[in-house]
């Protein structure tokens, strides 16, 4: 045999086709029979060492050198024992002659052994097997590995590893799955090559369709389109890689329209591109926020839930999508929390942006970035982004921009264009009714998303009769509550004329309004403002809804900059605890109750400095 012999060690995944007659292999004793000894060459190939070919006494699990005498047509392997001094041979690993399969092709290979190279995107330990969710360049599927009930298989495999999986393609509960016979982690250049291949494919699959363009003619939307495509691509990629998505949105009609449009697109995209039919329930969560910014309370809740899911279910940390909030300086504390956990954050908002927060964001869609303003509402942005994520939902959500626009009292030309799109299907008054119904129902939902109720209000459930009856009921109840509130508040509204010529009105929403019911202070202030705007037609009007430690600001015909005013007041009144912001002409301010009189006085002084558009 020469001075140095070669002994082959059969690698994982190798089969009978990978061995050759006459060669020597390193094996392991599996068991004994009267006619000989069974030898394992790896976890799936074994042969028979006839008792006439045994040269030494062995125990179960002992290593042994064997030569392949014959491979029979039925696959049985005849072996004979070989004894060699340890220093007279070298060991060479036999690797599987790999023919890689793609996850998308498993349905055509049921019952056959496959080899997959993929990224581990989730690891879930069940009471039986360990379920590895893996993602390659074609899709996502589960790989089930069993050691013993409830025991973690392949503990060396971690979330984010690139692995080579060997196993049988099966179908379980109408879902494709790989029954794992072996799995090992790829390292170095081998892993890098697989990652590069997967990333290249994901980049192409995540790219929004090129033929999707804005629904209407709009310079603002056209200028924003590249950033909207970027944001949509990030969302599509999150779905393709099984990254959970948390969608946080302002809990008003505009924010709801923005969020539900994206929710509708993403849920369908998840169902079209995933393995587990229930995964849309745990890969996507929509949560309303009371404030028009990402509060510490909200980010803390999100962090608590996402970290528990990461530990318990082996999920990736999520992508956070903020809609109708997320653009202002007030979001900064929450963004610092997301930075600690290296979370991906994207924003689609129409509040006046603060450039200091952009360093925390992967994408930021905001009309102010391209010379627009808050008239291009979050619901308009959300609908266009939803179409980029999944164009198939377009007809379902075509009325959302109009509902959002009338809800936020948009005066932008885009609103008229969106209303014309649904001419003959919904009137402007019907859009207003849906907007009011959303505001009314969300008030009672508090922090719950009310997914199915909201879908009924927006006529997404293919139940038009129920939609009409529900909206009519909610609008009737809401209008009755608003009328009662206005009858209570209006006699107590105080007025004065500012040096700028603007009419200023003070409405105390604490002392002269029903509390803890609909409409809340912000909505009540807006309704008072609407009445006063009609009463003082073509005149500049500013309305302050005053609470014990807050003020709601509504204005028309005054060139205000509320975020700038808040910053100025905070600098000038360090003991007042001032915070707040919003749009340029619509917003709110918080302060400490003990400084209420001084803050109101300073606020009136600041508002007087803004020029009024006098007729």
Predicted features, each with a name:
Residues 346-347, 351-366, 561-575:
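Flexible glycine/proline-rich, aromatic-decorated loop/lid segments
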Residues 240-247, 251-253, 355-511, 528-529, ...:
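A structured phosphate/pyrophosphate-recognition subdomain
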Residues 50, 142-143, 362-372, 384, ...:
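Short beta-alpha connecting loops at secondary-structure transitions
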Residues 199-243, 247, 256, 264-268:
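An N-terminal, well-structured beta->alpha segment
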Residues 144-146, 253-254, 268-345, 353-356:
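N-terminal small/polar loop signature for handling phosphorylated ligands or for N-terminal nucleophile
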Residues 1-117, 122, 126-130, 136-154, ...:
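Single-stranded RNA-binding regions, centering on S1/OB-family and related RNA-binding modules
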Residues 391, 498, 503-615:
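Glycine-rich, acidic loop segments that terminate in or are immediately followed by a histidine
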Residues 207-218, 278-287, 506:
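Gly-rich Lys/Arg/Thr-decorated short loops/hinges at beta-loop-alpha junctions or inter-strand turns
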């Amino acid at each position: 045999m020469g001075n140095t012999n070669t002994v082959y060690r059969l690698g994982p995944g190798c089969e009978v086709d990978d061995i050759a007659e006459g060669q020597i292999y390193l094996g392991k004793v599996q068991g004994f029979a009267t006619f000989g000894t069974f030898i394992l060459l790896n976890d799936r190939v074994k042969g028979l060492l006839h008792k006439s070919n045994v040269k030494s006494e062995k125990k179960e699990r002992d290593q042994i050198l064997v030569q392949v005498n014959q491979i029979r047509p039925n696959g049985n392997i005849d072996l004979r024992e070989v004894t060699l001094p340890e220093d007279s041979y070298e060991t060479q690993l036999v690797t599987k002659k790999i023919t890689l399969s793609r996850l998308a092709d498993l349905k055509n290979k049921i019952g056959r052994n496959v080899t997959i190279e993929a990224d581990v995107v989730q690891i879930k330990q069940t009471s039986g097997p360990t379920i590895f969710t893996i993602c390659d360049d074609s899709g996502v599927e589960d790989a089930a590995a069993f050691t013993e009930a409830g025991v973690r298989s392949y503990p060396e495999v971690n979330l984010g590893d690139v692995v080579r999986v060997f196993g049988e393609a099966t179908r379980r509960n109408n879902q494709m799955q790989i029954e794992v016979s072996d799995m090992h982690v790829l390292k170095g250049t081998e892993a890098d090559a697989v990652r590069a291949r997967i990333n290249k494919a994901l980049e192409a699959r995540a790219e929004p369709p090129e033929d999707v363009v804005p629904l209407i003619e709009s310079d603002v939307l056209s200028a924003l389109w590249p950033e909207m495509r970027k944001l949509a691509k990030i969302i599509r990629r999150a779905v393709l890689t099984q990254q959970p998505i948390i969608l946080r949105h302002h809990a008003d009609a505009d924010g709801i329209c923005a969020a539900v449009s994206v929710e509708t697109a993403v849920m369908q995209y998840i169902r079209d591109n995933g393995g587990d039919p229930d995964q849309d329930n745990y890969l996507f969560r929509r949560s309303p926020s009371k404030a028009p910014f990402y509060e510490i309370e909200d980010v803390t809740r999100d962090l608590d839930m996402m970290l528990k899911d990461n530990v318990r279910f082996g999920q990736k940390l999520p992508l956070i999508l903020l809609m109708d909030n997320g653009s202002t300086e007030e979001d900064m504390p929450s963004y610092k929390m997301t930075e600690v956990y290296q979370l991906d954050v994207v924003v689609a908002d129409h509040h006046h942006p603060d450039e200091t927060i952009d360093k925390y964001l992967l994408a930021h869609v905001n009309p102010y970035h391209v010379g627009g303003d808050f008239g291009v509402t979050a619901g308009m942005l959300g609908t266009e982004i939803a179409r980029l994520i999944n164009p198939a939902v377009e007809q379902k959500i075509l009325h959302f921009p109009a509902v959002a626009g009338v809800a936020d009292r948009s005066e932008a030309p885009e609103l008229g264009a969106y209303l014309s799109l649904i001419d003959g299907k919904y009137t402007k008054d019907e859009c207003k009714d849906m907007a009011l119904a959303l505001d009314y129902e969300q008030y009672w939902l508090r922090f719950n998303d009310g997914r199915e109720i909201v879908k009924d209000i927006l006529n997404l459930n293919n139940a038009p009769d129920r939609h009409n009856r529900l909206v009519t009921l909610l609008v009737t109840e809401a209008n009755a509550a608003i009328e009662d509130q206005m009858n209570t508040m209006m006699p107590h509204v105080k007025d004065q004329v500012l040096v700028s010529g603007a009419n200023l009105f003070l409405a105390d929403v604490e002392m002269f309004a029903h509390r803890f019911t609909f409409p809340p202070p912000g909505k009540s202030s807006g309704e008072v403002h609407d009445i006063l705007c009609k009463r003082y037609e073509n005149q500049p009007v500013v309305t302050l809804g005053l609470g014990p430690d807050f003020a709601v600001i509504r204005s028309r015909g005054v060139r205000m900059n509320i975020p700038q005013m808040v910053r100025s007041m905070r600098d000038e009144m360090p003991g007042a605890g001032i915070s707040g912001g919003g749009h340029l002409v619509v917003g709110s301010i918080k302060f400490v109750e003990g400084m209420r009189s001084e803050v109101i006085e300073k606020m009136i002084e600041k508002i007087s400095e803004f020029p009024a558009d006098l007729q």
